[in-house]
Amino acid sequence: MKIEGVLIPLITPFKDGKVDLASYEKLIRHYSKKGVAGFMPLATTGETPTLSDYEYQSILEKTVECNELNLPIYVGFGGNNTEKMTKDIKMLDKYNIKGILSVCPYYNRPDQRGIYEHFKRISESTSLDIVLYNIPYRTGRNIENDTIRRLSELDNIVGVKDACGDFTQTTELLLNRPDNFSILTGEDAFFYSTLMLGGDGGIMASAHLNTEKYVEVFNKSKQNDYKSALEIWKQVANMIPLLFEEPNPAPIKYCLSKTGVIASEALRLPLVPISENLKEKLNKFL
């Protein structure tokens, strides 16, 4: 079954230096009512590199516990130590999750053969579904489309979060897509364009806000009503650049705290709260 729709890469709320599980529970219940297709906790937007192993597991447990609609959960699980990942992934077996979102190995700068072998080893180490995560500006390496197509032939590699930043590359992948393989944009500003070319949806940090509008854009596109989808898209697209004007997820956390969805906009270093200038800009949209 293909993954499609709007999936939320959940933020991790903090308060007084600790993970705010009360706000996190509120967050999950909030988005469960918005028509989203699933949750992706503990990824980039979740500030995962700043979490302890205990916090990581606590957040995962809370996600599963509060997922009353039994929406698919794909947990962020990536790294650049393949051998360690093949062992650590066993820890996920005890949770009721659908799969993992796994970023291209970073810092080591593997070539395409190394990238393929890395994900092949991960796929052989788990029965969970795997969604590839291609975000070269963070990892230093691009997963080329031919590599994605090769990886799609492995049974449990079921899709890609495409944040390559190059719409020419995205277009080529969509036009020459593997069978039964989901292509989900991670470039928020490309959401409508990706749907127009037959994409399956998006995993977008900006969908924390105006969530129903994102879902409407997807639903109208599925009905081939691209004109209506575009009109709805125009209502939210202008806010997207502001949400990435300063490092993600700081602007989103500010908006969620300002509107009462979470208790605090706190982040963990090296990330810091947004500037007063950006707050003024965002307040006009809230």
From Swiss-Prot:
Q: What class of enzyme is it?
A: lyase
According to its UniProt entry, this protein's organism is Clostridium acetobutylicum (strain ATCC 824 / DSM 792 / JCM 1419 / IAM 19013 / LMG 5710 / NBRC 13948 / NRRL B-527 / VKM B-1787 / 2291 / W)
| Any one GO BP annotation for this protein | lysine biosynthetic process via diaminopimelate
Stated name of the protein? 4-hydroxy-tetrahydrodipicolinate synthase 2
Q: Which GO terms describe its molecular function?
A: 4-hydroxy-tetrahydrodipicolinate synthase activity
Sequence similarity: Belongs to the DapA family.
From the UniProt record, list the reaction(s) this protein catalyses. L-aspartate 4-semialdehyde + pyruvate = (2S,4S)-4-hydroxy-2,3,4,5-tetrahydrodipicolinate + H2O + H(+)
Which gene is the coding source of this polypeptide chain? Answer: dapA2
Q: Where is this protein found?
A: Cytoplasm
InterPro entries, A to Z: Aldolase_TIM, DapA, DapA-like, Schiff_base-form_aldolases_AS
What SMART domains does this protein's entry cite?
DHDPS
The EC number(s) this enzyme carries = 4.3.3.7
Looking up PANTHER family in the UniProt record yields: 4-HYDROXY-2-OXOGLUTARATE ALDOLASE, MITOCHONDRIAL (PTHR12128:SF66), DIHYDRODIPICOLINATE SYNTHASE (PTHR12128)
The residues annotated as site (Part of a proton relay during catalysis) are T44, Y107
